[in-house]
Amino acid sequence: MTQTKERKRFKDLNLLDRFLFAEAMEDQQNMELLLDIILNQETHLKQPTQTEKELRRTNEDRQVRLDVYTVDEKDVIYDAEPQKINTKNFPKRSRLYQGLIDSNLLPPGSVDFNALNTVVIILITPFDIFGHELYKYTFHMKCEEVPELQLDDGATRIFLNTHGKHLELVSEELIELLKYIELSTDETAEHCNSEKVQELHRKICQLKANKQMEAKFMQAWEEKVLERQEAYEEGKQVGEERGTDRERQEVAKLCGRLMELNRMEEMQRAITDMTYRKKLLSELEL
């Protein structure tokens, strides 16, 4: 197996790192600050934020974990996800998230589709998915023949790019927030004028100074390393037992890539399901 990446020190984590993002956003006030800036609104959440919320339609379906899931007083649902690696599938991944969230909103047999909540999905990345150098891309369904006609289905998907260039299209506060999310340090905070970003930084400093939180991070990292090693060795063994030289190389390469992306369940399925393995090889351009 390739050498495990060196563990990042807890104090060096940024909000783009899932562990710190999830722990920070469990604080309801932090999540409200984040949504206030991104959506330019005043947010009041009515229940505690859920992290790593698991969704699936049936036991046989693929499980999806939503990084940070919450609901405001108007029953608007928010899902926020930091994504450090460009898997080149974010538009369709956001579609999957939307579908799974919707499928869990109505009780079985209900046909009152107007009861579906408004849903806002937010993906935060340190790269530009769409190539137009924007900080913020907001998508709603609309009519091609009548562009000003919105479908008004209550679904919004927002993609945030920390490396945007068009300052005039977003608030200074959002730009400061995105810079801070990518590099959550004292130095970055010193250059932020936003009181909300400063408040968020104070909370992050408190988190990073918490020894129990540091121990939790170390334990989570060690468990993830063991899980990856076990899955990799299983894939390697199955490949050696069943495949040709080419197939063994494909399995090893795919397992390594899926480990980097923390897509462990998909890796385990790909080990024994050749059709699914080929699909992933094509998706990841391996």
Residues covered by each model-derived region:
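Elongated, amphipathic alpha-helical interaction scaffolds
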Residues: M1-L286
